């Protein structure tokens, strides 16, 4: 590729609305341009990196036995109504009508369409397992698109869907996809972690997210530095921090706490550790034709409620936070001084595992400006329902028993789900088993955010000059920067020879023949992030040398001109092999 025949749209300044590094650098490097909120043009530099990500994904999907197809972006509403997601999906689902008033959606995912394919094409267990995948543009109408490609509305995604005869076979398909994802992100050159996750709106029984580790990540990940354990904070099991409950050592007493409605303020006033206070959270579940059931959830003062775990407890599906009027009616006091002792009306008490093992703790007195200290289970109030209802914290014991947890931030770039029969049951996707009986197909689904990978990779790989691409997805592997290409025959001949040798060796090389000043050339390619640069100048050629500098190198080195192409080609191959 010659730069004079390519489009290089670099900018000195980032747009004012760009908040994170990847957004700023993708615009400045000429990779993307905004069309509308969360919708972008992918310019030639950006598209080259996208195609490289797609190529790696496609190779590994094919290697894992998946079969590529292509489904329509526009999907009929009837399929979504069959699955039940027409009503379940929120405003993120873009719905519209055609000229005949038929309703359609722009697909955010393709479970419905692929299930329709399977129910019409797969009739026997002999046709399974099968795994279909596509690489295609999706649309989700995000309420607040931001961060460039990291949270866009339109994006490119690889989505795959497996169909198996039973759950054991699904586990095998799932493992193949999990392993393929590990290979994909390793080949791309990302620092990542697979983490146990919640299934969210997709549904199903088991899933893992693949997160690129970055300080700007939207998700908190709990991991154990001394083992392989990692899970999204919303899914990580929180073990009890006390092995057993100590015997009571204090008498229960009412304590004045004027104006102290927060656990931190109560602990400071009483001169006790925050860990001895109890945070009370009031939820409600509605009952048709009757008053709601009120729940009091008890957490240690320094812990936070995990609503996803809470929603899975018996009786708490569809819960909501109680209104202030309900709180006053059941507890006799507004929020800030609530507790399980002396409620006005019966409430259901759920204690977190750690709280269940606490002794001599402090709770609200259900009276403004008062708390109760020295409270103990059994002696002062009934034994509670015990459940894991909190988020883990750094320092908590790892659920695998192999150390303590730490917390980092991650950017989700892939997700694998064991769907089970959620969609096949709803849409009647059945097959005939070995005994001649109709059975629902057992499904898995597997997504990778192609365009999101670019943003995530940049968040891990940048410096004050620009992007520092992992070798495998750089728009070009090598750039040739000739000093005076349009003025010096020797420079031009040497540059053209290097270009031909590198291209013949299969290296993705670009020759900057634009005639720009050295400072402009260097700044452009450092901003774009090409991993290897060769500078060809008359002075160096007189000594038989060409200047080489890797994008991550602090200093340039000199290479023999007659072997420079081979040396750089070997550097590229070595980097790709890592």
Curated annotation (Swiss-Prot):
A matching Pfam family: tRNA-synt_2b
Organism, as annotated: Burkholderia pseudomallei (strain 668)
SS bond list: none
CDD domains: ProRS-INS (cd04334), ProRS_anticodon_short (cd00861), ProRS_core_prok (cd00779)
Enzyme class: ligase
GO terms for cellular component: cytosol
Family note: Belongs to the class-II aminoacyl-tRNA synthetase family. ProS type 1 subfamily.
Comment, domains: Consists of three domains: the N-terminal catalytic domain, the editing domain and the C-terminal anticodon-binding domain.
PROSITE patterns assigned: AA_TRNA_LIGASE_II (PS50862)
EC identifiers of the protein: 6.1.1.15
InterPro entries: aa-tRNA-synt_IIb, aa-tRNA-synth_II, aa-tRNA-synth_II/BPL/LPL, Anticodon-bd, Anticodon-bd_dom_sf, Pro-tRNA-ligase_IIa, Pro-tRNA-synth_IIa_bac-type, Pro-tRNA-Synthase_IIa_type1
Any one of the GO BP annotations: prolyl-tRNA aminoacylation
Broad class of where this protein is predominantly found: cytoplasm
Localization annotation: Cytoplasm
Cited function: Catalyzes the attachment of proline to tRNA(Pro) in a two-step reaction: proline is first activated by ATP to form Pro-AMP and then transferred to the acceptor end of tRNA(Pro). As ProRS can inadvertently accommodate and process non-cognate amino acids such as alanine and cysteine, to avoid such errors it has two additional distinct editing activities against alanine. One activity is designated as 'pretransfer' editing and involves the tRNA(Pro)-independent hydrolysis of activated Ala-AMP.
Name this protein carries in UniProt: Proline--tRNA ligase
GO MF entry, a single one: proline-tRNA ligase activity
Reactions this protein catalyses: tRNA(Pro) + L-proline + ATP = L-prolyl-tRNA(Pro) + AMP + diphosphate
Oligomer and partners: Homodimer.
UniProt KW keywords: Aminoacyl-tRNA synthetase, ATP-binding, Cytoplasm, Ligase, Nucleotide-binding, Protein biosynthesis
Superkingdom classification of source: Bacteria
